[in-house]
Amino acid sequence: MWFWLALGSAVFAALTSILAKIGIEGVNSNLAAAIRTVVVVVMAWGIVFLTNAQGGIKSISQRSWIFLILSGLATGASWLCYYKALQVGEASKVVPIDKLSVVITLVLAFIFLHEQFTAKSVIGCLLIGAGTLMMVL
């Protein structure tokens, strides 16, 4: 099931890039990111209430709160950078650079989460890096 969810995420992320590039034309990139954020917040809380998951908020640990807040700040910074880059650059160049986050995530997961960095991971990172370079040059 995780594979199909990840694939769905990739499809929706691709749609996000195209829809954002069209929608951001003539709009301040920070304002566009804020509008997107409001939509995401409403949708996320709608799903929380629809699935009756709101009761779980009481059992979230202080550590989880800290890391969820930090993750939210990182998401906000990412979206602000992404929207500005998308506004001034070509989607076909901005999106591949943005997807270097895969490589950065693998490296950070190795350093901070002590996840395995296998030969396959290294080769994959190199291929993603080389592919990104090929797409943006």
State what each model feature region is.
Residues L15-V39, I57:
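Juxtamembrane helix-loop-helix junctions in multi-pass membrane proteins
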